[in-house]
Protein backbone atom coordinates (compact mmCIF):
# COMPACT_ATOMS: atom_id res chain seq x y z
CA UNK A 1 0.00 0.00 0.00
CA UNK A 2 1.39 3.36 -1.03
CA UNK A 3 -1.51 5.39 0.24
CA UNK A 4 -0.84 7.90 3.00
CA UNK A 5 -3.36 7.89 5.83
CA UNK A 6 -3.64 11.06 7.89
CA UNK A 7 -3.51 10.90 11.66
CA UNK A 8 -4.69 13.70 13.93
CA UNK A 9 -3.00 13.48 17.33
CA UNK A 10 -5.51 13.56 20.20
CA UNK A 11 -5.05 15.93 23.18
CA UNK A 12 -1.74 17.06 21.71
CA UNK A 13 -1.13 20.27 23.65
CA UNK A 14 -2.72 18.92 26.82
CA UNK A 15 -0.53 15.80 26.90
CA UNK A 16 2.73 17.65 26.24
CA UNK A 17 1.85 20.28 28.84
CA UNK A 18 1.00 17.55 31.39
CA UNK A 19 4.51 16.13 31.03
CA UNK A 20 5.87 19.52 32.21
CA UNK A 21 8.90 19.06 29.92
CA UNK A 22 12.31 20.34 30.99
CA UNK A 23 14.79 21.35 28.31
CA UNK A 24 17.36 18.79 29.48
CA UNK A 25 14.82 16.11 30.42
CA UNK A 26 14.60 12.46 29.36
CA UNK A 27 11.21 11.28 28.10
CA UNK A 28 9.53 8.16 26.74
CA UNK A 29 6.77 8.08 24.13
CA UNK A 30 5.46 4.56 24.56
CA UNK A 31 3.12 4.78 21.56
CA UNK A 32 4.94 6.71 18.83
CA UNK A 33 2.34 6.14 16.10
CA UNK A 34 2.94 8.83 13.48
CA UNK A 35 4.94 10.98 15.88
CA UNK A 36 2.52 13.78 16.70
CA UNK A 37 3.23 13.85 20.42
CA UNK A 38 6.94 13.16 19.93
CA UNK A 39 7.44 16.05 17.52
CA UNK A 40 5.58 18.44 19.82
CA UNK A 41 7.63 17.27 22.80
CA UNK A 42 10.92 17.65 20.93
CA UNK A 43 10.01 21.29 20.30
CA UNK A 44 10.02 21.79 24.08
CA UNK A 45 13.37 20.10 24.66
CA UNK A 46 16.76 21.75 24.45
CA UNK A 47 19.98 20.37 23.00
CA UNK A 48 20.49 18.20 26.09
CA UNK A 49 17.02 16.67 26.02
CA UNK A 50 16.36 13.05 25.04
CA UNK A 51 13.28 11.25 23.75
CA UNK A 52 12.91 7.51 23.30
CA UNK A 53 9.97 6.28 21.21
CA UNK A 54 8.36 2.82 21.15
CA UNK A 55 6.02 1.17 18.66
CA UNK A 56 5.23 -2.31 17.36
CA UNK A 57 3.91 -1.14 14.00
CA UNK A 58 6.46 -1.38 11.13
CA UNK A 59 4.94 1.66 9.40
CA UNK A 60 5.28 3.70 12.59
CA UNK A 61 8.90 2.59 12.85
CA UNK A 62 9.58 3.92 9.33
CA UNK A 63 8.21 7.30 10.38
CA UNK A 64 10.24 7.14 13.59
CA UNK A 65 13.48 6.37 11.76
CA UNK A 66 12.93 9.38 9.53
CA UNK A 67 12.45 11.58 12.60
CA UNK A 68 15.55 10.09 14.25
CA UNK A 69 17.57 10.94 11.13
CA UNK A 70 16.38 14.55 11.40
CA UNK A 71 16.84 14.92 15.15
CA UNK A 72 19.68 13.29 17.09
CA UNK A 73 17.82 13.74 20.39
CA UNK A 74 15.29 11.11 19.31
CA UNK A 75 15.61 7.31 19.13
CA UNK A 76 12.91 4.87 17.95
CA UNK A 77 12.64 1.26 19.14
CA UNK A 78 10.41 -1.44 17.61
CA UNK A 79 9.01 -2.88 20.82
CA UNK A 80 5.76 -2.83 22.72
CA UNK A 81 5.65 -0.29 25.53
CA UNK A 82 5.05 -3.33 27.75
CA UNK A 83 8.77 -3.99 27.28
CA UNK A 84 9.93 -0.46 28.00
CA UNK A 85 11.38 -1.60 31.33
CA UNK A 86 13.87 -3.88 29.58
CA UNK A 87 14.85 -1.14 27.16
CA UNK A 88 15.22 1.46 29.89
CA UNK A 89 17.40 -0.84 31.99
CA UNK A 90 19.57 -1.69 28.99
CA UNK A 91 20.17 2.02 28.44
CA UNK A 92 20.88 2.72 32.12
CA UNK A 93 17.83 4.97 32.47
CA UNK A 94 15.80 3.20 35.18
CA UNK A 95 14.65 5.73 37.76
CA UNK A 96 15.99 8.60 35.62
CA UNK A 97 13.13 9.24 33.18
CA UNK A 98 11.31 12.57 33.58
CA UNK A 99 8.09 11.61 31.82
CA UNK A 100 6.28 8.72 30.14
CA UNK A 101 3.43 9.20 27.66
CA UNK A 102 1.09 6.39 26.60
CA UNK A 103 -1.51 7.17 23.91
CA UNK A 104 -3.41 3.89 23.75
CA UNK A 105 -5.48 2.16 21.11
CA UNK A 106 -5.32 2.13 17.32
CA UNK A 107 -4.09 5.05 15.22
CA UNK A 108 -6.12 6.50 12.35
CA UNK A 109 -3.69 5.18 9.70
CA UNK A 110 -4.13 1.67 11.08
CA UNK A 111 -7.92 1.98 11.09
CA UNK A 112 -8.15 3.62 7.68
CA UNK A 113 -5.80 1.29 5.80
CA UNK A 114 -7.94 -1.70 4.70
CA UNK A 115 -4.86 -3.88 4.33
CA UNK A 116 -4.26 -3.78 8.08
CA UNK A 117 -7.58 -5.51 8.75
CA UNK A 118 -8.74 -3.39 11.71
CA UNK A 119 -11.85 -1.86 10.19
CA UNK A 120 -15.32 -3.24 9.59
CA UNK A 121 -16.06 -0.26 7.32
CA UNK A 122 -13.36 -0.99 4.73
CA UNK A 123 -12.88 -4.53 3.47
CA UNK A 124 -9.43 -6.01 3.86
CA UNK A 125 -7.54 -9.09 5.09
CA UNK A 126 -8.73 -10.16 8.56
CA UNK A 127 -5.46 -9.44 10.38
CA UNK A 128 -5.65 -6.78 13.14
CA UNK A 129 -2.08 -7.25 14.39
CA UNK A 130 -0.19 -4.09 15.37
CA UNK A 131 2.93 -5.90 14.20
CA UNK A 132 1.93 -8.21 11.32
CA UNK A 133 5.13 -10.18 11.85
CA UNK A 134 4.22 -11.32 15.36
CA UNK A 135 1.50 -13.46 16.89
CA UNK A 136 -1.63 -14.92 15.33
CA UNK A 137 -3.94 -12.91 13.11
CA UNK A 138 -7.63 -12.36 13.78
CA UNK A 139 -8.41 -14.79 10.94
CA UNK A 140 -6.32 -17.52 12.61
CA UNK A 141 -8.03 -16.97 15.94
CA UNK A 142 -11.51 -17.06 14.39
CA UNK A 143 -10.60 -20.23 12.48
CA UNK A 144 -9.31 -22.17 15.48
CA UNK A 145 -11.01 -20.86 18.61
CA UNK A 146 -13.98 -22.63 20.15
CA UNK A 147 -17.39 -21.00 20.20
CA UNK A 148 -16.93 -20.36 23.93
CA UNK A 149 -13.52 -18.70 23.40
CA UNK A 150 -14.87 -16.39 20.70
CA UNK A 151 -17.85 -15.45 22.88
CA UNK A 152 -15.54 -14.72 25.84
CA UNK A 153 -13.35 -12.40 23.74
CA UNK A 154 -16.38 -10.48 22.44
CA UNK A 155 -17.91 -10.27 25.94
CA UNK A 156 -14.82 -9.46 28.03
CA UNK A 157 -12.92 -7.22 25.65
CA UNK A 158 -15.73 -5.82 23.51
CA UNK A 159 -18.39 -5.66 26.24
CA UNK A 160 -20.75 -7.13 23.63
CA UNK A 161 -24.01 -8.35 25.17
CA UNK A 162 -24.84 -10.57 22.18
CA UNK A 163 -21.44 -12.28 22.23
CA UNK A 164 -22.85 -15.82 22.38
CA UNK A 165 -25.18 -15.28 19.42
CA UNK A 166 -22.36 -13.82 17.36
CA UNK A 167 -19.93 -16.61 18.26
CA UNK A 168 -22.51 -19.24 17.37
CA UNK A 169 -23.13 -17.62 13.97
CA UNK A 170 -19.39 -17.43 13.28
CA UNK A 171 -18.77 -21.09 14.11
CA UNK A 172 -21.72 -22.19 11.98
CA UNK A 173 -20.56 -20.14 8.98
CA UNK A 174 -16.88 -21.16 9.19
CA UNK A 175 -17.91 -24.78 8.61
CA UNK A 176 -18.75 -23.73 5.05
CA UNK A 177 -15.65 -21.61 4.40
CA UNK A 178 -13.06 -19.77 6.51
CA UNK A 179 -13.21 -16.09 7.34
CA UNK A 180 -10.46 -14.23 5.50
CA UNK A 181 -11.89 -10.72 5.00
CA UNK A 182 -13.09 -8.09 7.46
CA UNK A 183 -16.30 -7.39 5.53
CA UNK A 184 -17.21 -11.08 5.59
CA UNK A 185 -16.88 -11.29 9.38
CA UNK A 186 -18.64 -7.96 9.90
CA UNK A 187 -21.61 -9.13 7.83
CA UNK A 188 -22.09 -12.30 9.89
CA UNK A 189 -21.75 -10.37 13.16
CA UNK A 190 -24.21 -7.72 11.97
CA UNK A 191 -26.86 -10.29 11.07
CA UNK A 192 -26.40 -11.95 14.48
CA UNK A 193 -26.90 -8.65 16.33
CA UNK A 194 -30.64 -8.31 17.13
CA UNK A 195 -30.47 -4.81 18.63
CA UNK A 196 -28.48 -2.21 16.72
CA UNK A 197 -27.39 0.85 18.70
CA UNK A 198 -28.21 4.19 17.13
CA UNK A 199 -25.12 5.75 15.59
CA UNK A 200 -22.94 2.67 16.15
CA UNK A 201 -22.07 -0.08 13.67
CA UNK A 202 -23.36 -3.46 14.93
CA UNK A 203 -19.87 -4.95 14.58
CA UNK A 204 -18.10 -2.24 16.61
CA UNK A 205 -17.86 -4.01 19.96
CA UNK A 206 -17.00 -7.44 18.55
CA UNK A 207 -14.21 -6.00 16.40
CA UNK A 208 -12.86 -4.09 19.41
CA UNK A 209 -12.80 -7.28 21.47
CA UNK A 210 -11.08 -9.23 18.72
CA UNK A 211 -8.43 -6.53 18.23
CA UNK A 212 -7.71 -6.27 21.96
CA UNK A 213 -7.32 -10.05 22.21
CA UNK A 214 -5.10 -10.43 19.14
CA UNK A 215 -2.72 -7.73 20.40
CA UNK A 216 -2.94 -8.55 24.13
CA UNK A 217 -3.66 -4.86 24.66
CA UNK A 218 -4.85 -5.02 28.26
CA UNK A 219 -2.03 -7.31 29.37
CA UNK A 220 0.48 -5.01 27.67
CA UNK A 221 -1.09 -2.01 29.39
CA UNK A 222 -0.74 -3.55 32.86
CA UNK A 223 2.90 -4.45 32.21
CA UNK A 224 3.61 -1.07 30.66
CA UNK A 225 2.19 0.86 33.61
CA UNK A 226 4.33 -1.09 36.06
CA UNK A 227 7.42 -0.56 33.91
CA UNK A 228 6.67 3.14 33.48
CA UNK A 229 6.48 3.68 37.23
CA UNK A 230 9.85 2.01 37.79
CA UNK A 231 11.40 4.00 34.93
CA UNK A 232 10.37 7.39 36.28
CA UNK A 233 12.56 9.59 38.42
CA UNK A 234 11.02 11.13 41.54
CA UNK A 235 8.94 14.05 40.27
CA UNK A 236 8.54 12.42 36.85
CA UNK A 237 5.14 12.44 35.17
CA UNK A 238 3.02 9.57 33.84
CA UNK A 239 0.49 10.68 31.22
CA UNK A 240 -1.97 8.14 29.78
CA UNK A 241 -4.65 8.67 27.13
CA UNK A 242 -7.19 5.86 26.81
CA UNK A 243 -10.07 5.37 24.41
CA UNK A 244 -12.45 2.87 25.99
CA UNK A 245 -13.68 1.95 29.44
CA UNK A 246 -11.56 -1.21 29.80
CA UNK A 247 -8.32 0.71 29.27
CA UNK A 248 -9.37 3.64 31.41
CA UNK A 249 -10.43 1.36 34.26
CA UNK A 250 -6.99 -0.25 34.35
CA UNK A 251 -5.25 3.15 34.29
CA UNK A 252 -7.55 4.62 36.94
CA UNK A 253 -7.14 1.68 39.33
CA UNK A 254 -3.36 1.62 38.83
CA UNK A 255 -2.98 5.31 39.61
CA UNK A 256 -5.37 5.19 42.56
CA UNK A 257 -3.64 2.14 44.04
CA UNK A 258 -0.23 3.80 43.99
CA UNK A 259 -1.65 7.14 45.14
CA UNK A 260 -3.13 5.48 48.25
CA UNK A 261 -0.06 3.42 49.08
CA UNK A 262 0.17 -0.12 50.41
CA UNK A 263 -0.55 1.01 53.97
CA UNK A 264 -4.15 1.56 52.88
CA UNK A 265 -4.50 -2.22 52.60
CA UNK A 266 -3.14 -2.93 56.12
CA UNK A 267 -4.98 -2.94 59.48
CA UNK A 268 -5.00 0.58 60.93
CA UNK A 269 -3.56 -0.46 64.30
CA UNK A 270 -0.64 -2.39 62.78
CA UNK A 271 2.58 -0.88 64.24
CA UNK A 272 4.34 -0.46 60.89
CA UNK A 273 5.80 2.82 59.72
CA UNK A 274 7.85 2.31 56.61
CA UNK A 275 8.36 4.20 53.36
CA UNK A 276 7.70 0.89 51.62
CA UNK A 277 4.00 1.40 52.35
CA UNK A 278 3.79 5.09 51.46
CA UNK A 279 2.14 6.35 48.24
CA UNK A 280 4.29 6.24 45.12
CA UNK A 281 2.16 8.48 42.93
CA UNK A 282 0.29 11.75 43.30
CA UNK A 283 -2.75 12.26 41.09
CA UNK A 284 -2.60 15.55 39.20
CA UNK A 285 -5.93 17.16 38.45
CA UNK A 286 -9.06 15.54 37.12
CA UNK A 287 -9.34 13.40 33.99
CA UNK A 288 -9.18 15.55 30.86
CA UNK A 289 -11.28 15.21 27.73
CA UNK A 290 -11.14 16.67 24.25
CA UNK A 291 -12.46 20.21 23.90
CA UNK A 292 -15.47 21.07 21.76
CA UNK A 293 -13.09 22.56 19.21
CA UNK A 294 -11.05 19.34 19.03
CA UNK A 295 -14.20 17.22 18.78
CA UNK A 296 -15.31 19.18 15.73
CA UNK A 297 -11.90 18.81 14.08
CA UNK A 298 -11.44 15.16 15.05
CA UNK A 299 -14.60 13.19 15.99
CA UNK A 300 -12.45 10.18 16.97
CA UNK A 301 -11.28 12.15 20.01
CA UNK A 302 -14.73 11.95 21.62
CA UNK A 303 -13.88 8.85 23.67
CA UNK A 304 -10.40 10.00 24.75
CA UNK A 305 -9.68 10.49 28.45
CA UNK A 306 -6.30 11.58 29.82
CA UNK A 307 -5.04 10.86 33.34
CA UNK A 308 -1.87 12.29 34.86
CA UNK A 309 0.18 11.31 37.90
CA UNK A 310 3.54 12.31 39.39
CA UNK A 311 6.01 9.92 41.00
CA UNK A 312 6.63 10.54 44.71
CA UNK A 313 9.15 7.81 45.44
Swiss-Prot record:
Catalytic activity reported: cytidine(1402) in 16S rRNA + S-adenosyl-L-methionine = N(4)-methylcytidine(1402) in 16S rRNA + S-adenosyl-L-homocysteine + H(+)
One Pfam short name: Methyltransf_5
Gene3D superfamilies noted in UniProt: Putative methyltransferase TM0872, insert domain (1.10.150.170), Vaccinia Virus protein VP39 (3.40.50.150)
Protein EC: 2.1.1.199
Keyword S-adenosyl-L-methionine in annotation: yes
Places the protein is found: Cytoplasm
Keywords associated with the record: Cytoplasm, Methyltransferase, rRNA processing, S-adenosyl-L-methionine, Transferase
Record has Cell cycle as a keyword: no
Binding site for S-adenosyl-L-methionine: 35-37, 55, 81, 103, 110
GO biological process: rRNA base methylation
InterPro entries named among the record's database cross-references: RsmH, SAM-dep_MeTrfase_MraW_recog, SAM-dependent_MTases_sf
Family of the protein in this entry: Belongs to the methyltransferase superfamily. RsmH family.
HAMAP family (alphabetical): 16SrRNA_methyltr_H
Biological role stated in the UniProt entry: Specifically methylates the N4 position of cytidine in position 1402 (C1402) of 16S rRNA.
Full protein name: Ribosomal RNA small subunit methyltransferase H
Native source species: Pseudomonas aeruginosa (strain ATCC 15692 / DSM 22644 / CIP 104116 / JCM 14847 / LMG 12228 / 1C / PRS 101 / PAO1)
Gene: rsmH
Amino acid sequence: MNATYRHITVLLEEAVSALAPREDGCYLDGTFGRGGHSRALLEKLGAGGRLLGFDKDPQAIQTGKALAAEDGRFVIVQRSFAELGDEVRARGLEGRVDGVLLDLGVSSPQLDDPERGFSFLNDGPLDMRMNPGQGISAAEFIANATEEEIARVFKEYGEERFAKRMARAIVQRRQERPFERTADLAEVITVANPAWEKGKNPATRAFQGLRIHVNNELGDLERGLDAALESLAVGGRLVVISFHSLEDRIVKLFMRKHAKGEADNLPRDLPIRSKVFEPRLKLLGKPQYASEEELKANPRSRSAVMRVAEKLR
